[in-house]
Amino acid sequence: MEHIQGAWKTISNGFGFKDTVFDGTSCISPTIVQQFGYQRRASDDGKLTDPSKTSNTIRVFLPNKQRTVVNVRNGMSLHDCLMKALKVRGLQPECCAVFRLLHEHKGKKARLDWNTDAASLIGEELQVDFLDHVPLTTHNFARKTFLKLAFCDICQKFLLNGFRCQTCGYKFHEHCSTKVPTMCVDWSNIRQLLLFPNSTVGDGGVPALPSLTMRRMRESVSRIPPGSQHRYSTPHAFTFSASSPSSEGSLSQRQRSTSTPNVHMVSATLPVDSRMIEDAIRSHSESGSPSALSSSPNNLSPTGWSQPKTPAPAQRERAPGSSTQEKNKIRPRGQRDSSYYWEIEASEVMLSTRIGSGSFGTVYKGKWHGDVAVKILKVVDPTPEQFQAFRNEVAVLRKTRHVNILLFMGYMTKDNLAIVTQWCEGSSLYKHLHVQETKFQMFQLIDIARQTAQGMDYLHAKNIIHRDMKSNNIFLHEGLTVKIGDFGLATVKSRWSGSQQVEQPTGSILWMAPEVIRMQDNNPFSFQSDVYSYGIVLYELMTGELPYSHINNRDQIIFMVGRGYASPDLSKLYKNCPKAMKRLVADCVKKVKEERPLFPQILSSIELLQHSLPKINRSASEPSLHRAAHTEDINACTLTTSPRLPVF
């Protein structure tokens, strides 16, 4: 017993185990001696013994309410001790900060350097927190039925009913919820980190970010390393508990059945993929010379991350006993500009033959998931104002869906601005009327006029002014289906003086309205100017000729039409042209734009005209053999005796 009391006195004084305690010839077994360090016996000063003081360990509180105990060896730094514990959780020391908890000052902590000798911290309690500039995001799970073919990102099996994160797109079965990575990659913040590796700190601690074109953005985003299984998955996935106490606070989601796990409650606040952060930090450290670049700090947080809708968050304190309201708070996901998804890489489109060129660009036939038409616009070195105006118009064009409108498929910005539309196998109306001289029936001409008016009525309902309406931009697709192309794009069809858009008469003069030629208004293009151009198209349909064919001087046409001295000769209309169509042509080409009808009225007039045309209705009775061309060659006996032929 004397040996036991001596050993215990040594332990309680804080000097640790001595070799004589284990090497002695005492009858006490080593197992019993090792258990003395865990006995709760007070020392002479009345304090309890800390078991970590008696061994080379450090207790560490990690993010997300996790903790661990690490062993310390001589010569190891904090970075070496905590590397493994952080790696298995998908963390990087470069993204975190380590603190020593000051128990003598409750709630306070002192930051430590990662190169600190770990041996000097034996028995202490440490805490690891995220750095403020690391983009954090939480999963936003929602139950979803996948109507299209989908597979679970965890087990790679077919997925019909499951869950999907609305932020990162991770999808999984219900029984795979415990294997979902806790890291939700916020790609809007990752793109900011990769776009601005050379950002410098400006006034007020806000990084000054350079202005980029879409081409540089596309090249920057292409540096994102691909994931292993899922495009948003992280390589450091680990399992976590799928249960959460009800006292943690309720989310702003509907209450789900208690028989299924509420996977939305398993949201974890962790940084993005460690490999992406590592690459971004490496590229940031390799880029040397800082340069002061101009940027608007209104939309930036103190760490430089774009936050268009939410204010900059306050500095986070992640003490072990902190409240969980902030952790359960749903973070709004960053919204990407939807026009981003309509941009096509120039390397994906293969141009083949040159179809033709016009006032605003050159059209090529190309291949992009099938035959497409690529119109390379005549815009050299677009200014930022032109580029933004072009993107704004593309945002309008991509919403057009109509049977009589060419389908907009995307746009390109590399090297040149270009528009990609569907390919029409047929020829343009101009080629049919004036080159091939196709002979159409009157009801066919009226139907072409109706479809054209129907497509223009749709464009005007979308507040899109064509600005270049003519027979060259009307295509007959698969028979007599009208497709209107080359609409909108006021950015390309206007002249720019510096950063200001200046209107000028561009396009084909034969289809120009008089007010457009005169250019007395700042913006002469209107719905009525499109109606005048449509009236010239009607004139082409009903005469088979171009207007002013007797005038060979272009400047003379501009002068006479602009002054109101010349107008299309309506006496050349076909003799079998209905009177209603003649009146419509005359109304559309009136010199005063306020007197011209709009397309809803035009479409209604043509539809009434179509209904009034005489039609030969086909008989609904059964076919008769008497209508055969050579009924005398049919053997009546064969008809009555052959079992294979029907008898009428």
Curated annotation (Swiss-Prot):
Domain RBD: 56-131
Active site: 468 (proton acceptor)
Region feature Interaction with PEBP1/RKIP, mapped onto this chain: 331-349
Chain positions with Phosphotyrosine modification: 340-341
Modification(s) after translation: Phosphorylation at Thr-269, Ser-338, Tyr-341, Thr-491 and Ser-494 results in its activation. Phosphorylation at Ser-29, Ser-43, Ser-289, Ser-296, Ser-301 and Ser-642 by MAPK1/ERK2 results in its inactivation. Phosphorylation at Ser-259 induces the interaction with YWHAZ and inactivates kinase activity. Dephosphorylation of Ser-259 by the SHOC2-MRAS-PP1c (SMP) complex consisting of SHOC2, GTP-bound M-Ras/MRAS and the catalytic subunit of protein phosphatase 1 (PPP1CA, PPP1CB or PPP1CC); this relieves inactivation and stimulates kinase activity.
Protein's job: Serine/threonine-protein kinase that acts as a regulatory link between the membrane-associated Ras GTPases and the MAPK/ERK cascade, and this critical regulatory link functions as a switch determining cell fate decisions including proliferation, differentiation, apoptosis, survival and oncogenic transformation. RAF1 activation initiates a mitogen-activated protein kinase (MAPK) cascade that comprises a sequential phosphorylation of the dual-specific MAPK kinases (MAP2K1/MEK1 and MAP2K2/MEK2) and the extracellular signal-regulated kinases (MAPK3/ERK1 and MAPK1/ERK2).
Protein name, entry field: RAF proto-oncogene serine/threonine-protein kinase
Organism (species): Bos taurus (Bovine)
Gene expressing this chain: RAF1
